[in-house]
Amino acid sequence: MLKLGIIGTSWISHEFITAAHQTGHYHLQAVYSRKMKTAQEFCEPYGAISCYTDVIDFLDSELDVVYIASPNSLHFAQVKLAILAKKHVIIEKPAVTTPSEWKELVKLAKEHQVYLFEAARNYQEAAFQVVKDFLSNQEILGANFTFAKYSSKLPALLAGEIPNIFSDVYAGGALMDLGVYCLYLAIGFFGEPISSHYTAQQLPNSVDLYGQGVLIYPDFQVAFQAGKNITSHLPAEIYTKTGTLTLNAVAAINQARFVSHSGEVIDLPIQPCPHQMQEEAEAFALAIAHQKPSAYLEWLQTAEQVHKTLYQMRQSAGIQFKDEKE
C-alpha cells in the first residue's frame, strides 16, 4: 500500500484520491496547504489525515508518493523538493512550463531513484492503447481534435478578477490546461511532429482563452482546438486511407468507431472505467512496483516531446508567463 501525500486542495485532488483508493494501491496519509484551515477542511471526508502548512515537514513525513495539483507555475519547485526528499511524484498536467524544467526533473528523479509521472489521464487510459493498436495497421492522413469547455472561472475574469487559470503568474490558459490533452493524444499516437504552430484569442497578459493549433508530420497534419471561453461537443476524428476513426472525446474515451469508405463499421473494444482517473492511478502504482519498466521510459519520452511542442506553440502565439526562463 502506497502512502499518499497531496499538494493542492482543489477538486481535482479529491478526484485523484477517490480514484487512487479505488485501485486498492494507495492510502491517503497527509495533505499540505499554505493554510491549516484549508488543509483540515479538505481532509474532512477522509478521517484522521495529517495536515501540514510547512512543505518540508510534509515531505519529511512517512510518504511514498506525492500527488501535486497546485497552480502550474508552482509545480517545478514543489516537484524538485519532493524528489530531493526521495518521494515518487505524480504531477497533474502540465507538469512544467518549459522543456528544460522537465529534463531537469527527469535527471533528478533518476539520480534519486524515484519515479516521476505526469498525470495526463487520456494517455494512461486503457482505451488509448486500444486505439493506438488499431492505428498501427492504418495509413494516417490526418486528425482533428477538440477540447473546449466553458470555464467556471470565466465570470470572475469578466468581472475584472484574474483567476489562476487565466494568470500569466500561474502559467494558465487554454493551451496549458486543455490543449495539452490534444498534444498527448497526437504525440502518443503519431510521435513528435516536425513542426507546430498555434494562434490564439488572448488576454492583455498574453494568456489564451481559445486557440487553434497545427502539428506538422511528414505525410499529414493534425489540427486541434482548445478553449476555456466556449464549450464544444465535437468528437475527435482520425483520418486514414481506408476510412475515419471517431472517438467520443479527447479525454475519457469510452467509444471508438471506425467507418470505412465502403460503409463497414468497426466498434473498437473500449471498456469505460468507473472513474476517469482510476486507470492512471493504477498505472502509476504498477510502475512504482517495477511492473512497467519499458512503459515508464516511453512515458518520460512522450512527456518530453509534449513539453517541447507545448513550448514551441506558446512561442508561436506569443504566450509568455511571468518570470519564466528557457
Give the positions of each predicted feature.
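Beta-loop-alpha module in the N-terminal Rossmann-like domain of NAD(P)-dependent dehydrogenases
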Residues: 46-108
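C-terminal helix-rich "cap/oligomerization" subdomain common to oxidoreductases
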Residues: 65-67, 283-326
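Predominantly a Rossmann-like dinucleotide-binding segment in NAD(P)-dependent oxidoreductases
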Residues: 125-192
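Rossmann-fold dehydrogenase core element
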Residues: 104-121, 140-142
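Contiguous beta-strand/loop segments that form the cofactor/metal-binding neighborhood of enzyme cores
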Residues: 182-253, 284-287
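Active-site loop of classical SDR/Rossmann-like NAD(P)-dependent oxidoreductases
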Residues: 271-282
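Hydrophobic residues in well-ordered beta-strands that form the structural core
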Residues: 91-92, 116-118, 247
